[in-house]
């Protein structure tokens, strides 16, 4: 109900109705008052004219009694006539009740003395009670010299008339006026409602448009064809709505681009306002904040506070959960509406870079060690032979055998480095052929039979000799050689190395399993990384470059397959190779 009363249509309609009603009431009151006054005055003037004529008639008549009777015949109905010579000595015996009361009014009302003493006409309204009801009369006294009077200068002609006819006329006029006013008010009400609806229709459209704009809908643009102020307002509002839509679209596009850029960043990004609340973040930052510990959180808060104080960019290193981060905090003058400042925090995960740098350092150290050892042996044994320290044929033969072994070791190390360099520069190529897998495994069996016996290992090959695979013999030989060498390095006498094959609907599967020392869980995700090496303390004494498993992964992936590892520390390791079946 209140919302309807607050409507512009209702307010305008009620205003028009109130104004028209007020005007009609005032006009009706003025008209009724005027008509009452008019008819009263007309009646009074008519009575006065009658009194004047009677006065003249009686004064000019020789037979005054006949003239009075004649006048009474004319006036008595519906009014009354009295000619009073002396109001103080007037007999009431032959008068009617109304005339008696009229005579009493003349006698007792001092205003009528002016009729007898000054010769003035006097008019008064007199209320007469008769038969339990009251009736109002107009009583007029008119001076005359028709009869001689020793007590006063004038006699009086008094005519009274019932005002009921005037009241009836006034009532009829009042009813007609009220009915006319009601009809006019009804017509005005309908017209005012139509007019107010017509006038406010563009305003209601503008209201609907403003509501839709506030809700983000800029498509509704009502057309107002009027050339008045409302039409101009509508055109201006449509123009404003179009410009707002363009600005909002531009802001939305910018925001979407910004959000996409922020979410696509590998760094975690946080926006912090003056209240130290996060107002902006991307997925990476959310993941980091979900896993942050108390020490790292305190470190981050200290850096943020330092940035607020210094208003300078701060860059610090953070280590958390065995990962390494670089935290950069930058002061921003305006980060929120109202010109409030804040800090943008960028958290970059440098774990891979840190590990790569560490692996490079380890690689340089390992390669230096690997190169120094065979070179030192080569130099020592050759110097012994050249200097004649070793002269016996058997000793010379043993020294040359050591030189040969170390040369092979040095050659293998250099070949691994050259292979990786070649693969980085030229890529890796494989020549797959459909051939029995048994050919490769038989080759491995012959190759490592003596080594297994020397190391005291149980090496078994369980495979289906009739099964054919699609693979490059030389590349797969390189893979298995690397994997079996690794297995031999991480086992001790009595352990077992088993090579078995299997299949599923789309892949051929090869398992290389050992019961050696195994690999710790924190190393499993990095064993295939370039230059990565597991703790050398668990190896048999041979060092490597950390490139073997990296090369194996590249070869298998070039075949269109995959290589995975499962290991449990202290129980052994299993490498799983999956190659697509021949078409």
UniProtKB/Swiss-Prot annotation:
The modification Phosphohistidine is found at residue 369. It is a multi-pass membrane protein. The keyword DNA-binding does not apply. One of its GO terms (cellular component) is plasma membrane. It is found in: Cell membrane. Its main location: membrane. This is Sensor protein SrrB.
């Amino acid at each position: 109900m209140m919302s309807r009363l607050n409507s512009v249509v209702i307010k305008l309609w009620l205003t028009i109705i109130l104004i028209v009603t007020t005007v009609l009431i005032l006009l009706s009151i003025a008209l009724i008052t005027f008509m009452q006054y008019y008819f009263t005055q007309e009646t009074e003037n008519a009575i006065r004219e009658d009194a004047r004529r009677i006065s003249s008639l009686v004064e000019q008549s020789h037979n005054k009694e006949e003239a009075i009777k004649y006048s009474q015949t004319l006036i008595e109905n519906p009014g009354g006539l009295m000619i009073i010579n002396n109001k103080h000595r007037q007999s009431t015996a032959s008068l009617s009740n109304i005339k008696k009361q009229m005579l009493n009014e003349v006698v007792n009302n001092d205003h009528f003395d002016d009729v007898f003493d000054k010769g003035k006409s006097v008019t008064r309204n007199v209320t007469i009670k008769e038969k339990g009801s009251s009736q109002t009369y107009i009583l007029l006294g008119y001076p005359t010299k028709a009869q001689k009077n020793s007590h006063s200068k004038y006699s009086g002609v008094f005519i009274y008339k019932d005002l009921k006819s005037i009241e009836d006329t006034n009532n009829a006029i009042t009813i007609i006026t009220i009915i006319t006013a009601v009809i006019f008010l009804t017509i005005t009400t309908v017209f005012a409602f139509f007019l107010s609806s017509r006038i406010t229709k563009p305003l209601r459209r503008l209201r609907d448009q403003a509501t839709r704009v506030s809700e983000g809908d800029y498509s509704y643009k009502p057309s107002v064809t009027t050339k008045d102020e409302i039409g101009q307002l509508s055109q201006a509002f449509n123009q404003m709505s179009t410009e707002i839509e363009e600005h909002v679209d531009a802001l939305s596009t910018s925001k979407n681009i910004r959000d996409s850029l922020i979410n696509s960043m590998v760094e975690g990004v946080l926006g912090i306002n003056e209240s130290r609340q996060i107002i902006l973040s991307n997925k990476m930052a959310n993941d980091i904040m979900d896993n942050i510990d108390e020490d790292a959180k305190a470190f981050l808060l200290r850096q943020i506070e330092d940035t607020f104080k210094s208003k300078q960019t701060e860059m610090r290193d953070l280590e958390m959960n065995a990962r390494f981060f670089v935290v950069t905090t930058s002061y921003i003058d305006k980060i929120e509406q109202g010109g409030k400042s804040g800090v943008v925090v960028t958290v970059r995960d440098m774990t891979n870079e840190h590990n790569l740098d560490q692996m490079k350092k380890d690689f340089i150290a390992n390669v230096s060690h690997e190169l120094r050892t065979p070179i030192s042996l080569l130099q020592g044994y050759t110097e012994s032979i050249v200097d004649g320290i070793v002269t016996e044929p058997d000793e010379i033969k043993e020294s040359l055998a050591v030189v040969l072994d170390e040369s092979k070791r040095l050659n293998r190390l250099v070949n691994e480095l050259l292979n990786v360099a070649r693969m980085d520069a030229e890529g890796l190529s494989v020549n797959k052929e459909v051939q029995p897998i048994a050919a490769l495994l038989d080759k491995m069996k012959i190759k490592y039979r003596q080594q297994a016996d020397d190391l005291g290992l149980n090496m078994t090959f369980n495979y289906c000799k009739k099964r054919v695979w699609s693979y490059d013999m030389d590349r797969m030989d390189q893979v298995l050689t690397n994997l079996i060498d690794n297995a031999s390095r991480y086992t001790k006498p009595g352990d077992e190395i088993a090579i078995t094959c299997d299949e599923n609907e789309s892949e051929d599967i090869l398992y290389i399993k050992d019961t050696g020392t195994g690999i710790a869980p924190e190393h499993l995700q990095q064993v295939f990384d370039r230059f990565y090496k597991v703790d050398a303390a668990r190896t048999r004494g041979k060092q490597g470059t950390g490139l073997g498993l990296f090369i194996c992964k590249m070869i298998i992936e070039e075949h269109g397959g995959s290589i995975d590892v499962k290991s449990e520390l202290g129980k052994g390791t299993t490498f799983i190779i999956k190659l697509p079946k021949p078409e």
